[in-house]
Amino acid sequence: MHAEGDGEKNALTQSPSADWNPAQYERFRDERSRPFFDLLDLVQPRPEMRVVDLGCGTGELTRELHRQLSARETIGIDNSPAMLAKSAAFAGGGLRFEQKDIDAFASEGDVDLVFSNAALQWVPDHEPLLRRLTAALTQRGQLAVQMPANNDHPSHLTAFAIAGEPPFRAALGGYERQWPVLAPEVYATLLHRLGFREQHVRLQVYAHELESREAVVEWVRGSLLTDYERRLPAELWPHFLERYRQRLLPQLEDARPFFYPFKRVLLWGAR
């Protein structure tokens, strides 16, 4: 899904009603794509690679992944019909797409690169997840993952708080987002235990200049807030969004442009 909403996956990849909104998500395409290219720079290209892109979204960046690696085969996997509807335009020449939950992905040691940009934050229990993804790799396979880690910013904390307030808490059935993304040093330890002979793990702060503080609402509306939108009754969602806007904006500097620091974890390992 290349969708950096942040949260747990039981509720995510199997979420209730609404689908992703590609147009809303891609309003900040340049800013959201920058970490993809940083992650791709960590990958060691090899001839005839078989690549899997977990959470491929619209497929546009998957096409770039396939092209830059000159891969023999690249499979983009996503669970969003709306996102995958866009991907058909990029299929062909060894690149194809499948609708599937990330939890349903499994392979028997025949993948040269498992790549995931801004998707695994939707999946819980990262230690068993990384173990499963490692099992899909060939003997010299690589794992490359980027995940948002901005859950302690007011843009995220405000949404978490409002979800616990009436009338939204009852409408959400008491649902609370869990945060599965671990500290960078924990991922480094996991990669070591899983037998990766080389690794690179870092926390990076991306410096985004948005038009105004109001743009933060639109940014988060295309990612994190989608989880609440699809869980809430249609008549409550506008009220949630308005309360979020009224609560968040006073916490942010009224500046033009508005500086929005966004933390992300990037990890890469080679067996």
Question: Can you say where each PLM-predicted feature lies in the sequence?
Answer:
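Conserved class I S-adenosyl-L-methionine
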Residues: 2, 7-49, 60-64, 83-86, ...
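Short glycine-centered segments of the SAM/dcSAM-binding site in methyltransferase folds
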Residues: 50, 141-142
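Class I SAM-dependent methyltransferase SAM/SAH-binding core
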Residues: 52-105, 128
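A short acidic, Gly/Pro-enriched loop at the edge of an enzyme's catalytic core
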Residues: 106-114
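A short SAM/SAH-binding and catalytic strip from SAM-dependent methyltransferases
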Residues: 113-126, 149
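Helix-to-beta-strand junctions that scaffold the AdoMet/dcAdoMet cofactor pocket
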Residues: 123-124, 137-139
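Conserved catalytic/acceptor-binding region of the Class I
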Residues: 127, 142-211
